[in-house]
Amino acid sequence: MEDTNSLIEQRQAKLAALQAKGIQPFMNKFTPDRGCGEARASLKAWFEAKQTDPASTVGLAEGTAVMIAGRITAHRDMGKSQFLDLKDVSGRIQIYAQKQTLGDEQFDIFRHLDLADFIGVEGTLFMTRAGEPSLKVEKFTILGKALRPPPAKWEGLADTEIRYRQRYLDLIANDDVKSVFLKRSAIVREIRAFFHERGYVEVETPVMQAIPGGAAAQPFITKHNALGCDFYLRIALELYHKRLLVGGVDRLFEIGKNFRNEGLSPRHNPEFTMLEAYQAFGDYETMMETVESLVKRVALSAVGSLKVYHPRPTKTRLEVEFGATLLGEGKVPDYLEKRFGGELLNARGCLVEFDSASFGKAEPFELAASAHAVVSHVLQVISDHIMGDVVTFDEGSAELEFINELEGNVQRLEELSKRRVIDLEKWERRRYKDLVTAKVAEVSQGLVPAWFSISPQERRRVAIEVLELGGDIAAGYEDFEVTGAVFEKLIEPTLINPTFVTHLPKELVPLAKLSPDDPTTVEVFECCINGQEISPGYTEQNDPIAQRDVLEHQAGGEQQKLDEDFLVALEHGMPPAGGIGIGIDRLCMMLLGQESIRDVILFPQLKPKV
């Protein structure tokens, strides 16, 4: 295989040759009249309709002239004719070029096009004998010459860091990834439509703030040179939205970036997209209905169903994770290759291409299950051979390492073949204290039946010694934080179907109103789906005196932490209101079957390369 530098040099030489002929391979403009996938689908629809109704006018007929543009993703040289696959965001189409049609000079240029080049094509549609919708090239224009080769399917996509750091390569090679981000865009568009239809006004509030507020989080700090003072990137949208409620904007929402200078995890990114919405004269009950209606609508729009599956492996993910290495091809120890060559050869034949014709229409779960069966069989044959005392292998031998690798592949394939069904039709409501009490009683095997009736000191002891949460409870944790650790570690991960957890401890949400029936709690909900919080919401505190007392207590006497302008705004009078926040990234993770927040953010934060 040629190294990358050699391939780059070859492409640069082709560029120089084109320019020497007076060809400019970096055009300013080209105007296609339709997409590649659109042209292919339309011709296919015409062809299929003609089989049953010769008079049908559905689609584009053979012989229709079209102009398309896209990236070359496949190139097959047949001598005096060339077949290329051209692809854009709408899909792909096969294009066919003949020396007889283009002439010697143009055909020679066409033959030297490279994978990943952008070209514009004019020609006529036709169906091949094999029934493949195609375009016969009559004229072509090089629009953008690629000076680097595309990544090899197995090598370029197997490196997760390359996928995140060079997302453009991921999008070029992986249709599943592109689909995720197109659907994310559709989700955000549907959210906006939902709120506009309900009479909400979309607003924009400051990203740089003199005092970060609305959440307990570490902010990023920046300096405003002209004003000569520090500013903070916002950690929440809330306080400016409440100013707008004071100003008479009764229904408002914003979709924007928040920034928190905290840790990275599969669920956390320092820069994330947040939706916040507020409705005057509503409360937390009002906002629960809003969240449920919104999520159902978006799910039906983006996924087409109220049932969502997790995790959702894609064909590309299966190819990347396993591919040709699923059975250790190229590194099988000699003894195993000789002894089990037949089984390995047959198995590889089943696994060469997950997206080949035999697997083309299968669901990813079915592909994983099929691969699991194949690899399990090979492992079983080898294991039976060893168990029969036919042969033994030394510890650390290549043979044992290979067998251990097979066992790991079997286990991962088994996980990929499992479905977790999230039913968005069923929404529950559970009180926070009830959930915690029941879980503690269950885990302690009845030793602690009434968590909230024992002393704070005893709660800490039980959490550490009985519930085994010592690693999650810091020495300085207050009592409500100890209970919070119990909820986050033992309860939240079990809430798969949508669950509104209500009446949280008042210390957790200082900007919410107290519950009339239990003054130790607030009128708050956390909407949990698939084991993580998707949306908090609550009845907003509109009493300026009560709000000042809570915020002063929270600030601990540090006056600079108080947002006096916000408190003054409340003193001008704010209507009762309900508010919600929904993490767009987590919502997309849930709806699109992604296990990491980085898989729904185009360019997630990574440590810069040195």
What are these regions (language model features)?
Residues D3, Q12-K21, M27-T286, L294-K296, ...:
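Class II aminoacyl-tRNA synthetase-like tRNA-binding/catalytic domains
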Residues S42-T52, L300-S305, A438-Q445:
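Short regulatory "switch" loops immediately downstream of catalytic or recognition motifs
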Residues E197-E202, L300-Y309:
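Surface-exposed helix-capping loop/turn segments at secondary-structure junctions
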Residues P206-A299, Y309-R419, K426-V610:
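A translation/RNA-centric and nucleic-acid-associated enzymatic feature enriched
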